[in-house]
From Swiss-Prot:
Name of the molecule in the record: Methionine aminopeptidase
Lineage: Archaea, Methanobacteriati, Methanobacteriota, Methanomada group, Methanobacteria
Cofactor binding, per record: Binds 2 divalent metal cations per subunit. Has a high-affinity and a low affinity metal-binding site. The true nature of the physiological cofactor is under debate. The enzyme is active with cobalt, zinc, manganese or divalent iron ions. Most likely, methionine aminopeptidases function as mononuclear Fe(2+)-metalloproteases under physiological conditions, and the catalytically relevant metal-binding site has been assigned to the histidine-containing high-affinity site.
Gene3D superfamilies referenced in this protein's UniProt entry, alphabetically: Creatinase/methionine aminopeptidase superfamily
InterPro entries: Creatinase/aminopeptidase-like, Met_Aminopeptidase_Type2, Pept_M24, Pept_M24_MAP, Pept_M24A_MAP2_BS
GO cellular component, one term: cytoplasm
Taxonomic source organism: Methanothermus fervidus
Record: residues binding substrate: H60, H172
Length: 188
């Protein structure tokens, strides 16, 4: 259990550093390399290639070594970080609205507000889901809480992305926690 905790703590620290590192005009690949280097500096290894998904790319994009695309002010950047310590995995993600869009002449303020609201919805859904988790709760109930929270913000959750259990050396093991109400009556 201690190595799971260590991996989780490193993932959390790296996530915080990644949030501060995201800048307009930065290459996606440079951000991925920064994140993976920070993981290694802290004595761990990446559990999977860092995922950096921009705007309409919802999740799981890892930039190839020749990717020269840049993150721009106003972009919505989703960062998914995996850390392992001897195969014990910590997995975390966050979403960042890249600063500097306020100075752009052609930037859509309405889109910026919608993106801020989307980040707030995701953070609230996560918090509500965590508060729902307890011994004996049905997995479908957790998904229902997530879906209801996101809907209250005027958004629809992505049904084919889930939370998941992790085991040593196995990133997606056993149970999946849906983002939507489901028929899963399996209990924690």
């Amino acid at each position: 259990m201690e190595k799971f905790k260590k991996a989780g703590k490193i993932a959390s620290k790296v996530r915080k550093k990644a949030i501060k590192a995201v800048k307009g005009e930065m290459k996606i690949l440079d951000l991925a390399e920064f994140i993976e280097n920070e993981i290694e500096k802290m004595g761990a290894k990446p559990a999977f290639p860092c995922n950096i998904s921009v705007n309409e790319i919802t999740a799981h994009y890892s930039p190839p070594c020749n990717d020269d695309r840049k993150i721009l002010p106003g972009d919505l950047v989703k960062i998914d970080i995996g850390v392992h310590v001897d195969g014990f995995i910590g997995d975390t993600a966050t979403t960042v609205l890249v600063e500097g869009y306020e100075d752009l002449k052609n930037y859509n303020d309405e889109l910026a507000e919608k993106n801020k609201k989307m980040i707030e919805a995701a953070e609230s859904a996560l918090e509500n889901a965590i508060n729902t988790i307890r011994d004996g709760v049905e997995i479908g109930k957790i998904g229902e809480v997530i879906e209801n929270t996101i809907n209250k913000f005027g958004f629809k959750p992505i049904s084919n992305l889930t939370g998941h259990t992790i085991d040593r050396w196995v990133l997606h093991s056993g149970l999946s926690i849906p983002n939507v109400k489901g028929q899963n009556s399996h209990k924690l």
